[in-house]
Amino acid sequence: MNTRNVLFIFFLLLTYQWVFAQRSYKIEKVDALIDYDGLLNEEVWKTTEIADSFTVNSPVFGAQSRFASEIHMFYDNNAIYIGGNLFDSNPDSVNYVLSQRDDTGNADWFGISLDPYANSVSAFAFIVTAAGVEIDGLESSDGMDESWNAVWKSAVSKTEFGWSFELRIPYSALRFPNKSIQEWNMNFWREVRRVRETSHWNPIDPQVFGSITQSGKLYGIENVVSPLRLSITPYTTGYIENSFDSDLGKQTWKRRVTGGVDLKYGLNDAFTLDMTLIPDFGQTTSDRQILNLGPFEVRYNENRPFFIEGTDLFQIGGVFYSRRIGAAPFNFSRSLENLDENEQVVNNPYAAPLINGTKVSGRTKNGLGVGFFNSIEGRTSALIVDSLGGERFVETNPLTNYNVFVLSQNMKNNSSISFVNTNVAREGGNRDANVSVGELDLFSSDGMYRIKSSLKSSAVIDEQIKRGHSFTAGLSKVSGPVQFDFGYYEESDTYDPNDLGFLYNNNERVYSASLELNDYTETKRF
């Protein structure tokens, strides 16, 4: 093979892209009562359009799934209804493994993705396993955020041909434009676990970047109104603590009662207000115990619902680490400074109390995402007692205000431009901090190439102002069998976003390059 032929083949690989016609489904409005038993026995299921002929995504893309799926949909003034018969050539082999919520485990499952704004940026995902486990989340180009939870209904049933399901998704679980005629992006997924086959109603090519951009169309929804989205949850919590007091030589009891309120309100079809007053996260999952022998702090996952629900906009730029809020007091070790020989610290709060939290987020019909987050942290003091019984208090955490502001504008071809600002303001002469981010993410018209860059600026205001910067630029080919990435990243030695962000270390320059050849065709060996 001569050089000219080699170059020609390589050029074809670079520009290769599967082309499939976008599928569509016309949904009808029907007033019908459903007996949620997972069986499609009601007459309405027999009169609606069928979505079938799923295309395999993995292990080998492009073939029609050998497991037939027949999906039906209709809607009324309150919700969208989905029912499906999922056929299996070996019904006894369907995996019905039970798992926790938001975890498919080792079970067969089916899901639907709904993008009401048809902007291919984010979508609502609803999944049910053959064992009846529900999974929901917000899908984006970064994956699926399963911390998002909604109230919806599902039922599944074993059948002689495989299994079947019924779903009811109320409009209160969705955000959609305020217009009389709706046209949404939509897709269905199915996984047959024992053979690891994943298929979709509208084909999703693994060699093309992004799954939401490869959705089908849902049309036919008309004259539906988004319901009032309002939730008020007052609560009270009591604590009883029993411990041994060495000074008194006996067991002692401590009692504490707290109370607060959570509020969630849909300002309009696009924006939601979340507020919490005197939050109590005592019921959230505890962190794993980690013995840290390294030079860097441990980055923990966020488990508090207020800080994980509806925070996708605040993750832009990578400068918001919510675990900074309500963490150890800012001057936790100050209580150990200037201790006299006859003094000891008898009480030093290990976490700063949260007074309130507020966030507003959403995206307009023109693709402008707006996010505002604010939280106030209370004061803490350590109690120091001397040998004569004298007491004094040392402030370990000042009153602190945390603020995040985000603007993100969607553009053509799933591109975007964003601005993020985080600010930490502490009372008195304590340290303040500010970080600003500008980010540009551009895709070519065919979705094959991507340019992404960001510029970050930090300012730590203490006795003096310490400024720093971070810069990133990259060019990637993100679709096709041949993919590559070239990138550059630098951080100045004074860049410090850690008052409200997380950075292991600064003062570095990184050049990177990668090349991938992805072959999804079936061979004798694979």
Where do the protein language model's features map onto the residues?
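Structural preference for beta-rich elements and adjacent junctions enriched in aromatics
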Residues: A21-S408
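Membrane-embedded beta-strand positions of outer-membrane beta-barrel proteins
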Residues: G38, P234, M275, V360, ...
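Outer-membrane beta-barrel channels and translocator barrels
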Residues: Y117-N119, S172, P227, N268, ...
